[in-house]
Every structure is written in C-alpha cells, then in structure tokens.
Amino acid sequence: MPIIRKNDVVTERPVIIVLYGTPGTGKTSLATTANSPLLIDTDRGFDRAVQRPDIVVTASRWEDIYNAEVIGSYVVEDGKQVWKPGLISECKTIVVDTAKAMLDDYLNAFAIQQDHKLGTNSLKRYGVMGELFKQFVGILRSNNSDIIFICHDKETQEGDNIKHSPDCTGQSKDLLIRIADQVGYICKENGNRVIKFEPQDNRVGKNVADLQDTWIPAYGTEEFDTCMADIIKKVKKAIVNKSDAQAK
C-alpha cells in the first residue's frame, strides 16, 4: 500500500474528465483532440467528428469493450501469470462516447445476463454495475490512460429554472461525477463554443483544477488540434500545484 507523507513530491497522474452538452456542440470532436485517443463509440457517430481518432472501437454490448483485444488479459509467460494489455496500451487517452450507453445499457444488460435475479433487484444490480465499472476504470488508470466520458445534456425543471446535467440515470451519474476530476458543460455563447467547469445553480459541474470558462478554438486551427490535450495538461498541473501548496 503506497504511503504519501506531507512533504513527499506528488507526480502527475492520469485524469478523468466528463464532457456533456447538447447535440452539435462538438463533444466528440473536442475529445479526440486529446493525446493519442482511442474512441469507444457506442453511438455509431465517430464519422461525424471533424477528425478521426487513432483507434475506434465500435461497441454494441459490454463484451465489445471489456475483452482481451481492447482491454487486455492475463497470460502465462515463462511459467508466470502476467497482464498483457490490449489496444489501450497503444493510446494515451480513452474516450467513451457515450457514458450512458455503456453504463445504463451495456453494463446493465451484462449484469442481468450474469445473474437473472438482478433483473428484479435494482439495488443489487447497480452495485454489480458499479463494481464492474470501477474495475474497468482501474485497468485504464493502471495503463496511465487519461479518460474522457462524453454525455448528452439532460434538462430538468427545478422550479422556474432549467438545470443541465450529464444524461445518465441517477446512480450512474453519481458514480461518474464522483470519480471525475473535471465535469464540463459545453454550450454556445455569442456563436462561440465554450466549456464551463464551475458548478452553478443551473448546471452540474466539477472544477478540481479551478479552470476558467474555456473557449473552444475554431476547427482547422492549430489551437483546436491540441485543445483537449492542452486542457488535460492544465488539469494535471493544477492538481500537482494544489498538492504542493498543501505540503507547505
């Protein structure tokens, strides 16, 4: 068990970012400007992005994602059991588009497939789904992969106000927000696209790195080509700086 003391130097670690917004705001296109992205496409929409990721995994069930070819598996080498990573080892960023399909559809169906009794016991089913999801994220983290989860925008009426949040069922959404370092809402202002990380009364957000509203550059510019990679760099640097400040 690693132990970190107050004066120890904390190094950069992989981060988890949730991006959500309405259709047409370029969520997938933005996510694939991260470093060396592998896109897990559950919406069959990778061809709508303005550029193609390094690798695209088209998925219609959990087994299309969690398998030896994509994730990896244990193999025996020289009489020892060792972990052999799959396609994830070729990329630095894993993009899941969308998180709702993976969690609410694929993982839900897989859990019931493994134990039919879970079909009538939602509490236990969500517990199993949560453990499978944590295992998936844990493998990606051990691969030093940054992770981006893409969600659609869900609007809910709260009194006279409309609140925006990632479109997932309650428990899945809670799980995503809990493990995320940043949760950003993509919208348009004055014809420009912007990511807002700071939580407000009218939107869900998470801003561990204290990032300001971030304008998304126009397609085809050098700034856009590395936009998500640059955001991830800022998040990692901010987390390390916060940790260093706490040690003083």
Q: Each predicted region: which residue ranges?
A:
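Glycine- and charge-rich intrinsically disordered segments
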Residues: 1-11, 15-21, 29, 224-248
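Short, well-ordered beta-strand core segments
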Residues: 37-39, 147, 183-185
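Conserved, well-folded catalytic cores of nucleic-acid-processing
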Residues: 68-72, 105, 150, 179, ...
